[in-house]
């Protein structure tokens, strides 16, 4: 499969790294399953009605059927990466026989993914009553990974712009302008979003929404001011308004998403339990970006927090010109295989929670087949689980960013990249 993607020998194309092409294939797998899950979460086909596991849904309840289908698709994908992650534990050398499984045997791995998804449609619904809560817990872990990647990406972009400004001298002013536009633009959008949320969601006696919105704005502004303080910049020169703006904008989105996940009531603008399309689309985009970014990271993405565990690589491969694939793992692995698959597994379960609006199954007996007149056993967003996961996540991202600012001051002997 890699030779198909990178070109056959004899074609004059630029070679790509073997580790990159491998991760690209896994990303394609994830994207394909995600697209299918998104489509089936809204539209189910007539042949789904013949599946016994979907007969617990009332006739015409496509929301119930869509949720059950999404659970099974994402479970198959998550189990696929969990199994591969377990097999790849402690693989650090390309000489390890297990490394060949990571980079090859694609027909076998495609078959494995298909079989796992197929078999999941025959697993009793009682299992998925538990799986919904496992997916919520794993989704929270993936949100944490997203937060780390977001802050890391913001620092990387800021340092890249600053480097170009210094290297290009007078002609580098365009990068300075770009950095200023992105910094103040992010802050302006976050403030505007906060004002709009107060107008539409914080009116009247909705004190809980007012608390979410105002508290989020307050802590973001405090950390933003701290990021440009003299003491922080002395030990963390790369800190600045750009990272603060990105964090502030993302936290504002999380609060917006949390409020839109509230059950129908006096403080919710939704008259139904269905989530707003905008929150699902934005969440899906963040998921795909996070998965892609984490996939092409060279290590386990913990350097930002002060923990260094680099994975070396040997980029030189004499066969690259003829094969189209440069073997950058001649001796050491270019990335942590287990962490890679762990991230994808959590991403799959986060996708499950996202597409079903963090749905949970009711406590009714879902193991027995019901008639077409039975009520749906899927309760979509019946509680405040998703609300608090997102609200707490917004607080965690601020704390993580705060740690990157004060960490170098408190732990001066540790290297902070």
From Swiss-Prot:
Signal peptide as annotated in the record: none
Cell location: Endoplasmic reticulum membrane
A single Gene Ontology CC term: endoplasmic reticulum membrane
Membrane topology: Multi-pass membrane protein
Membrane-spanning residues: 25-45, 69-89, 104-124, 131-151, 180-200, 208-228, 239-259, 276-296, 339-359, 391-411
One Pfam family cited in the UniProt record for this chain: Serinc
Entry's Gene Ontology BP terms: phospholipid biosynthetic process
Keywords: Endoplasmic reticulum, Lipid biosynthesis, Lipid metabolism, Membrane, Phospholipid biosynthesis, Phospholipid metabolism, Transmembrane, Transmembrane helix
Protein task: Enhances the incorporation of serine into phosphatidylserine and sphingolipids.
UniProt family annotation: Belongs to the TDE1 family.
Protein name per UniProt: Probable serine incorporator
Upper classification of the organism: Eukaryota, Amoebozoa, Evosea, Eumycetozoa, Dictyostelia
Gene name, Swiss-Prot/TrEMBL: serinc
């Amino acid at each position: 499969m890699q030779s198909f993607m990178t070109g056959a020998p004899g074609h004059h194309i630029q070679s790509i790294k073997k580790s990159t092409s491998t991760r690209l294939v896994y990303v394609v797998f994830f994207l394909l399953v995600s697209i299918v899950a998104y489509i089936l979460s809204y539209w189910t086909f007539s042949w789904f009605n013949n599946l016994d596991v979907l007969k617990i849904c009332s006739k015409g309840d496509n929301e119930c059927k869509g949720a059950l289908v999404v659970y099974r698709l994402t479970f198959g994908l998550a189990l696929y990466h969990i199994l591969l992650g377990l097999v790849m534990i402690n693989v650090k050398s390309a000489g390890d026989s297990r490394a060949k499984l990571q980079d090859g045997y694609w027909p076998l791995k495609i078959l494995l993914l298909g079989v796992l998804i197929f078999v999941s449609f025959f697993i009793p619904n009682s299992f998925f009553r538990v799986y919904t809560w496992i997916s919520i817990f794993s989704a929270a872990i993936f949100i944490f990974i997203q937060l780390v990647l977001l802050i890391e990406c913001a620092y990387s972009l800021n340092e890249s712009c600053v480097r170009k400004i210094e290297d290009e001298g007078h002609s580098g002013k365009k990068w300075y302008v770009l950095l200023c536009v992105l910094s103040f633009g992010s802050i302006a959008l976050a403030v505007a979003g906060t004002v709009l949320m107060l107008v539409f969601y914080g009116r009247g006696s909705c004190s809980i929404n007012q608390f979410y919105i105002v508290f989020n704005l307050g802590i973001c502004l405090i950390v933003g001011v701290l990021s440009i303080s003299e003491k922080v910049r002395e030990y963390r020169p790369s800190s600045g308004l750009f990272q603060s703006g990105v964090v502030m904008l993302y936290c504002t989105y999380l609060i917006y998403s949390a409020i839109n996940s509230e059950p129908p009531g006096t403080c919710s603008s939704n008259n139904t339990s269905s989530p707003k399309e905008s929150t699902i689309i934005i969440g899906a985009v963040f998921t795909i970006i996070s998965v892609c970014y984490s996939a092409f990271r060279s290590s386990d993405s913990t350097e930002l927090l002060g923990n260094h565990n680099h994975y070396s690589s040997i980029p030189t491969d004499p066969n690259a010109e003829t094969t189209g694939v440069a073997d950058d793992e001649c001796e050491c692995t270019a990335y942590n295989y287990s962490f890679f698959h762990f991230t994808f597994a959590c991403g799959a379960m986060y996708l499950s929670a996202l597409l079903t609006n963090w749905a949970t199954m009711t406590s009714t007996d879902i193991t027995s087949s019901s008639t077409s007149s039975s009520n749906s056993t899927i309760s979509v967003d019946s509680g405040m689980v998703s609300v608090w996961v997102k609200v707490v996540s917004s607080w965690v991202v601020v704390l993580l960013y705060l740690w990157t600012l004060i960490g170098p001051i408190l732990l001066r002997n540790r290297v902070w990249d």
